[in-house]
A protein has these predicted regions:
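Hydrophobic packing segments in regular secondary structure
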Residues: 1-42, 166-247
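Extracytoplasmic/secreted proteins, especially bacterial periplasmic and envelope-associated proteins
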Residues: 50, 57, 78, 92, ...
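Short N-terminal segments immediately surrounding and downstream of signal-peptide cleavage
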Residues: 38-52
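Amphipathic alpha-helical segments with strong coiled-coil propensity
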Residues: 49-56, 63-70, 74-171
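Short hydrophobic/aromatic segments of transmembrane alpha-helices and their interfaces
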Residues: 16-18, 106-109, 136, 157, ...
């Protein structure tokens, strides 16, 4: 008996498989087209340099917050010492007056003003001042002195509390700026980690060459012929500071560092001047107001401070022949570079 079942259609299975394969290929092609291309070495370097510049800005804000915290801490310590000494003096005055009162009591003649003064907690004395003023006691001078001490002590305590509040705010700001710096540096490191090992090695070699060139250059010898007059120091103080800076060529940039083995930009200049027994402010923005401003590059002399960018977040020394000596940024070392590598704003002669 002949079978009436329909014959198998192998072609249908094949078509289904081919269709699925084609769909998958289209999907993969679409995903590839939509995926963002991996940034190349040069693009990553540009982004990293930008992040390093932003980190340096945040570093100067951190330095300012740290300086403010240090100043406020000293003020708080001083006020707390004054309060402690004032309390001791007040206690001594009270004890002396108490001794007089005891002697009068034993002799049967306690002065009414002392009786009123000693009748309750001495801290409530100010509320009774008007009554004491009317007594005209022979002890009024002692009581007035205690009253004056109490008022002074209350004022000192108020000032100390105000400074403690300011100190807490400064510590909060310091923490915020520290997180800002670390965040920028971490972001830069993530970008560097996205490169291939070969690309990272190439960037490292570029930085090594820049460091090597900047640590072996001599601005006074870079120009053939007649030496630049600007290589003569601006003053003996500037000469001593600049010489101290030269002695640290090759030391690494570390944000927030003030030497002697690592520096940020303003830490480098402030440390160098300190070696010349000249105290200048800690931050680049404050250093910009530490001396006479010079707006023309042609008027700069060796040892002058030079400032860059609109917000003045970078500072270094003028070295002569269009070169500066500075601590540039993360990954770099104290070195010479062209003054034209950054937007120059003005110099300052200390």
């Amino acid at each position: 008996m002949a079978s009436h079942r329909r014959a198998k259609q192998p072609g249908r299975t094949r078509v289904t498989v081919l269709t699925a394969t084609a769909a998958a290929a289209v999907a993969l092609t679409s995903q590839g087209a939509n995926a963002a291309p991996q940034p190349g070495k040069n693009e990553v370097k540009a982004k990293v340099d930008k992040l390093y510049a932003e980190a340096e800005k945040a570093t100067e804000k951190y330095n300012g917050a740290k300086e403010e915290q240090t100043k406020l801490q000293k003020q708080v310590d001083g006020l707390q010492d004054k309060v402690a000494r004032g309390q001791e003096e007040l206690n001594t005055l009270r004890n002396n007056l108490g001794t007089v009162a005891s002697a009068q009591y034993r002799s049967g003649g306690l002065d009414p003003s002392l009786q009123l003064f000693l009748s309750a907690d001495p801290d409530t004395y100010l509320d009774k001042a008007s009554a004491l003023d009317q007594l005209g006691s022979k002890h009024s001078d002692s009581i007035d002195e205690i009253q004056s001490k109490q008022r002074a002590l209350a004022q000192q305590r108020k000032e100390a509390q105000t400074k403690l509040t300011e100190l807490a705010e400064a510590r909060t700001e310091l923490g915020a700026q520290k997180r800002q710096v670390q965040g920028k540096l971490n972001e830069a490191q993530k970008l560097l980690n996205s490169l291939t090992a070969k690309e990272r090695e190439a960037l490292k070699e570029e930085e090594t060459r820049a460091n090597r060139a900047g640590t072996t250059a001599r601005p006074d010898l870079d120009k053939p012929g007649k030496p630049d007059k600007a290589t003569k120091p601006a003053s003996s103080r500037a000469a001593a500071a600049y010489a101290a800076g030269v002695s640290k060529i090759g030391k690494p940039y570390v944000w927030g560092a003030t030497g002697p083995n690592s520096f940020d930009c303003s830490g480098f200049t402030s440390w160098s001047f300190a070696q010349a027994d000249v105290q200048i402010p800690r931050t680049s923005q404050a250093q910009a107001n530490a001396g006479q401003r010079i707006y023309s590059q042609s008027q700069l002399k060796q040892g002058d401070l030079v400032f860059f960018y609109d917000d003045l977040h970078h500072v270094g020394f003028y070295a002569g022949n269009g070169q500066i000596l500075h601590s540039p940024r993360t990954g770099a070392v104290v070195r010479y570079e062209s003054i034209n590598n950054m937007p120059f704003k003005f110099g300052v002669r200390i």
